[in-house]
Design a protein with these regions (language model features):
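Predominantly a Rossmann-like dinucleotide-binding segment in NAD(P)-dependent oxidoreductases
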Residues: 10, 128-215, 345
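Glycine-rich phosphate/pyrophosphate-binding beta-alpha loops
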Residues: 188, 213, 237-245
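Conserved SAM-binding strand-loop segment of SAM-dependent methyltransferases
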Residues: 53-60
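Active-site beta-strand termini and strand-to-loop segments that position acidic
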Residues: 219, 224-230, 251-253
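N-terminal Rossmann-like dinucleotide-binding module
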Residues: 1-51
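C-terminal glycine/acidic-rich active-site capping loop/insertion
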Residues: 228, 254-326, 348, 359-384
Length: 384
């Protein structure tokens, strides 16, 4: 085969944008051959706006069972991600899954076990891994040239959302429909970056404020404290209610500090290891010499299209993925730990008790409000 035939399951905000990219030919080695959506209004939209040859299904399982595609992209409500992924594997389909990998790690662990039993390609839509600035941060930190991490700070409050956004779907911003708020919907990208660049912390203490700024039952404002195995600490702050918001990611290491803000990466490079300087300097107020430079990157930032290109190329040629599907559990581990810590009111060790997390989640699902359905779809371009 010279092109991967893709079936899109879910034509909501993200699915629609992915479908448009494929129809416009932005992914040369992939073609959209089928879509599935339970909403008649979305299926009718596809009949009116998509090429006539694209097959239209109501159920994702029926699309998977058909012979019209080699791979599927899963862009449905979060709880269904692992379920549909495992069904696709059973039918010999390659899978690329939208974030998050699922709602709770116990569910995603089962999905990863299924992935390990198949030869099919499994990828996650972690589009921020294509960002040249984050890739350079990953290179500098994991390469070790700046020494060990001492501190991680990320204020990411530029995820502004209106009440209209939260009212746009019956499943959105509910425990039973979405499984969480800003941590599950917007921040999987950021949490993936933290674990990809800095690794997973060993302990989390979080404060997740429920419906602080919007009429929703899930969190829209979070402050979390992180502790790492080597003694490093971190703070993660996010909300969907700050305007204007901030997006500043700082990593302090033994030989300097990286600051990512406004699309630029600045390196504050020390003349020597701070730990050595602290122990050997004679003056009580001496500080290490420091030079500040903007770090050059390759400038590439293909986002979702780049992830799809890599997925197709991996299937056809065996080239590397942007993000292996089994890595989705790592960022979810962070968000689950934050939720659990906030629910229990004390720090949570990682790994945490997955059965306890599910028990606490199900308590909230049992009381989850029912919302009226809506067919509103937003253009998500530039919002991620």
């Amino acid at each position: 085969m010279d092109k991967v035939r893709l079936g899109m399951i879910g034509i909501g905000n993200m699915g629609t944008n992915h479908a448009k990219s494929l129809i416009e030919g932005l992914v040369p080695e992939m073609e959209l051959t089928a879509i599935a959506d339970r909403k008649e209004a979305r299926r009718e939209y596809c009949r009116e706006h998509f090429p006539a040859g694209i097959r239209i299904f109501e159920e994702g399982q029926d699309l998977i069972a058909s012979d019209v595609c080699d791979a599927v992209l899963i862009a449905v409500p979060h709880y269904q991600h692992p379920e549909l992924t495992m069904i696709a594997f059973d039918h010999g389909k390659h899978v690329i899954c939208e974030k998050p990998a699922g709602v709770y790690t116990k569910q995603v662990r089962e999905m990863n076990e299924a992935a390990a039993r198949t030869d099919q390609v499994f990828a996650m839509m972690f589009n921020q891994r294509t960002n040249s600035v984050y890739r350079k941060m990953h290179e500098l930190v994991t390469g070790g040239e700046l020494g060990a991490i001492k501190r991680v700070n990320w204020i990411v409050t530029d995820w502004y959302r209106t009440q209209s956004y939260y009212d746009s779907g019956s499943w959105r911003a509910t425990w039973d429909g979405e499984g969480g708020g800003v941590l599950l919907n917007q921040c999987p990208h950021n949490l993936d970056m933290i674990q990809w660049i800095c690794g997973l912390p060993s302990k989390v203490q979080a404060f997740c404020h429920i419906g602080k700024w919007h009429d929703i039952e899930v969190e829209d404002d979070v402050t979390a404290y992180l502790e790492y195995p080597n003694g490093a600490t971190g703070v993660f702050i996010t909300t969907t209610a700050d305007a204007p918001g901030t997006n500043r990611f700082e990593i302090t290491l033994e030989l300097g500090k990286l600051v990512c803000e406004n699309g630029k990466l600045m390196l504050h490079k020390l003349s020597e290891n701070e730990r050595t300087f602290c122990k050997t300097a004679k003056g009580g107020f001496d500080t290490p010499e420091c030079t500040v430079t903007e770090v050059e990157t390759d400038g590439e930032n293909e986002q979702h299209v780049g992830v799809l290109k890599a997925f197709a190329s991996n299937i056809l040629h065996g080239t590397p993925l942007i993000a292996d599907g089994i890595e989705g559990i790592r960022g979810l581990t962070l968000s689950n730990a934050m939720h659990l810590s906030s629910w229990l009111g004390h720090p949570v060790e990682i790994p945490f008790d997955e059965d306890l997390y599910l028990e606490e989640l199900n308590k909230r699902r049992a009381d989850s409000r029912k919302k009226e359905d809506s067919d509103v779809v937003f253009d998500t371009a530039g919002s991620y």
